[in-house]
From Swiss-Prot:
Coiled coil start-end: none
Organism: Xenopus laevis
Inhibition and activation profile: Exhibits substrate-dependent heparin activation.
Positions that bind ATP: 15-23, 38
Protein name: Casein kinase I isoform delta
Active site as annotated: 128
GO BP, sorted A to Z: endocytosis; non-motile cilium assembly; positive regulation of canonical Wnt signaling pathway; positive regulation of proteasomal ubiquitin-dependent protein catabolic process; regulation of circadian rhythm; signal transduction; spindle assembly; Wnt signaling pathway
Post-translational modifications: Autophosphorylated on serine and threonine residues.
Induction behaviour: Constitutively expressed in retina.
MF annotations from Gene Ontology: ATP binding; protein kinase activity; protein serine kinase activity; protein serine/threonine kinase activity
């Protein structure tokens, strides 16, 4: 039986789940386009979807903010229908073998700072800045970075008076410990500075492949958070950023120097990385590592196919000397008559056994991935492309998914 939401959206297969809500692929019947549909049971202990949808609506119109298409209740569920997005930066990081080039990190940093600035301009702090919560767009918006998951967002100032929330201590850790600011670990109320410090750790994660406080073992979650906090505080910024341009250390030092209610100088931080970008001689062509990887895979597949054909041609001439110099039609007829032979087991002396090339399934898969991945430069990567290279069964869950990736509310989110 066909399930519909809001009498306009057809509910498809489940593509993600989170701590409070499941995400489904859907179809806007009127517009014939795919959407993301997030469902939350109305009987859930702590309903969150309605609050999140209200924050999304306040953010509407901003660059890199997903569009809310419909919100309401349907049967036993609270529902939010949203624009469908592509894979998260965490998915793309895995796709690129867990290392981004400096160019890609700087291209991302520029947009990510702007997304955080926009949220702050709307009187909210995000409080869960991490790679899973930044997604690339689809189609013509394939180079645009989106920010998602406002499940932990909090208003930090009054919209009319701009009165800042008061300084508090003894707060529980909110967000993801890996990227949490030091003040968050210390139980201090979060403010704008903490979102930006978290982004600094995300950028170094992209540079390094992992952070020094990853993989720490502990008996309880609380003890693990304490170990992460200790390691983070005992790792000097200069040590964390060693081997990378000084701008990354400058960025983190700037964020840590901010007072609780300070307004960050977003333009200064953006310009810091833009100057580095230009000094490196990079071009703002928005060709990210995943685009280059696609091109490389496509070329490799084409080269392998060409080499295969050449080997077949050489083999054919070796087996049929008389074919040399004949027109292609004649050689085809000759080959056709000679190949009608009884099928007998090949022996080790048969050159056919050793030299007949067979298409490499992995390479062929890469070629197909590439054809889907890139219809011009640069474009987005779809989740089906990601899963052809690796297992991406993990879902982030706050918001909008791609065909396999969600944009989501934390379940893998609140670590």
């Amino acid at each position: 039986m066909e399930l519909r939401v809001g009498n306009r959206y057809r509910l498809g297969r489940k593509i993600g789940s989170g701590s409070f809500g499941d995400i489904y692929l859907g179809t806007d019947i009127a517009a014939s386009e795919e959407v993301a549909i997030k469902l939350e049971c109305v009987k859930t202990k702590h309903p969150q979807l309605h609050i999140e949808s209200k924050i999304y609506k306040m953010m509407q119109g901003g660059v890199g903010i997903p569009t809310i298409k419909w919100c309401g209740a349907e049967g036993d569920y609270n529902v939010m229908v949203m624009e469908l997005l592509g894979p998260s930066l965490e998915d793309l990081f895995n796709f690129c073998s867990r290392k981004f080039s400096l160019k890609t990190v700087l291209l991302l940093a520029d947009q990510m700072i702007s997304r955080i600035e926009y949220i702050h301009s709307k009187n909210f702090i995000h409080r869960d800045v991490k790679p899973d919560n930044f997604l690339m767009g689809l189609g013509k918006k394939g180079n645009l970075v989106y920010i998602i998951d406002f499940g932990l967002a909090k208003k930090y100032r009054d919209a009319r008076t701009h009165q800042h929330i008061p300084y508090r201590e003894n707060k529980n850790l909110t967000g993801t410990a890996r990227y949490a600011s030091i003040n968050t670990h210390l139980g201090i109320e979060q403010s704008r500075r903490d979102d930006l410090e978290s982004l600094g750790y995300v950028l170094m994660y992209f540079n390094l492949g992992s952070l020094p406080w990853q993989g720490l073992k502990a008996a309880t979650k609380r003890q693990k958070y304490e170990r992460i906090s200790e390691k983070k505080m005992s790792t000097p910024i200069e040590v964390l950023c060693k081997g990378y341009p000084s701008e990354f250390a400058t960025y983190l030092n700037f964020c840590r120097s901010l007072r609780f209610d300070d307004k960050p100088d977003y333009s200064y931080l953006r310009q810091l990385f833009r100057n580095l970008f230009h000094r490196q001689g990079f071009s703002y062509d928005y060709v990210f590592d995943w685009n280059m990887l696609k091109f490389g895979a496509s070329r490799a597949a084409e080269d392998a196919e060409r080499e295969r054909r050449e080997r077949e041609e050489r083999l054919r001439h070796t087996r049929n000397p008389a074919v040399r110099g004949l027109p292609s039609t004649a050689s085809g007829r000759l080959r056709g008559t000679q190949e009608v032979t009884p099928s007998t087991p090949l022996t080790p002396t048969s050159h056919t056994a050793n030299t007949s090339p067979r298409p490499v399934s992995g390479m062929e898969r890469e070629r197909k991935v590439s054809m889907r991945l890139h219809r011009g430069a640069p474009v987005n990567v779809s989740s089906s492309d990601l899963t052809s290279r690796q297992d991406t069964s993990r879902m982030s869950t706050s918001q909008i998914p791609s065909r396999v990736t969600s944009s989501g509310l934390p379940s893998t989110v609140h670590r």
